[in-house]
Amino acid sequence: MSRQPPIRIGARGSKLSLAQSGLMQARIAHALGVPAGASKDEIEAAAPLIPIVTSGDRIQDRRLMEIGGKGLFTKEIEEALLDGRIDCAVHSLKDMPAELPPGLVLAATPEREDPRDAFISHVCERLEDLPKGARLGTASLRRQAQALHVRPDLEIVMLRGNVDTRLAKLERGEADAILLAQSGLNRLGLGHLTRSWLDPDACPPAPGQGALVIETRAEDIGAPWLEAVRCRQTTIAVAAERGALLALEGSCRTAIGARAILDGARLSMIVEALTPDGAQRFRREGDITLTGADDIAEARAFGLTLGAEVRAAGGDAIILPE
């Protein structure tokens, strides 16, 4: 492939976001014609990283639901995309709202990392083994609800901040254990800190967890370099999960888990929503055989169906009051 004009990559300024964007930067540069084994300068020239500080990064002392939701991690980046200051953005898919601003699309999803939630503690090996009344640190309503469903005696400690900040709070004794995405730990070279994992069938992760996604302007979705970084299997699975997210009107005020697995043409899926206190859980699971006509649309429709069934069962009980 001949060299193309540079593709400017927008990314949050956090260590994890820059690590994730750096992983994609080399792949994008290669897709643009930069040879394997090229120097960092050559890669940077073809696909420069443009760090952008978001509102979600600046405000660290409150839950996302209190300050505007997931969109606070993407607002400034999406404005830069629409203004033409950057050409694409790399995000953690789990942080993306169910609906995007007009003119923007999720254009490519590469191979997924480990989607599980990691349990980290100096007290014990597993969530189930925590002492009665132990403090569990998380800012995720889903992780809170799933943990309380298993262990209603736990005290939930609000723990926002980047991965290093959360680990430091654990070291200082502000919590007895914390839950983090294993994918983020792996990308930061911290996977060895995990003591165990939440069972992804019993506690499905957030829709899209473990997957990165490249967001572009709608008119750029057919660019050849995007095709070079797409993973069909991941794209189909996350289409189902995000379909469920949309049906459940997912936000930071709803505790939603979804896990889809593609095996050949068979797509299986678990979707659940819980009340914020974990006392009630509404769950649906099933599988379909994809026809091959439009696998992504079929997967999304499957997710929408299961999500709608969970929404009908849970009603307003699954939404945290404002």
Swiss-Prot record:
Keywords linked to the UniProt accession: Porphyrin biosynthesis, Transferase
Catalytic activity, EC: 2.5.1.61
GO biological process: protoporphyrinogen IX biosynthetic process
Cofactor(s) the protein needs: dipyrromethane
Residues bearing PTM S-(dipyrrolylmethanemethyl)cysteine: C252
Cofactor note as given: Binds 1 dipyrromethane group covalently.
Tagged with keyword Amino-acid biosynthesis: no
Gene Ontology MF term list: hydroxymethylbilane synthase activity
Stored InterPro entries: HemC (IPR000860), Porphobilin_deaminase_cofac_BS (IPR022419), Porphobilin_deaminase_N (IPR022417), Porphobilinogen_deaminase_C (IPR022418), Porphobilinogen_deaminase_C_sf (IPR036803)
Function: Tetrapolymerization of the monopyrrole PBG into the hydroxymethylbilane pre-uroporphyrinogen in several discrete steps.
Other remarks in the entry: The porphobilinogen subunits are added to the dipyrromethane group.
Family: Belongs to the HMBS family.
NCBIfam families xrefs: hemC
Subunit structure comment from the entry: Monomer.
Name of this chain's protein: Porphobilinogen deaminase
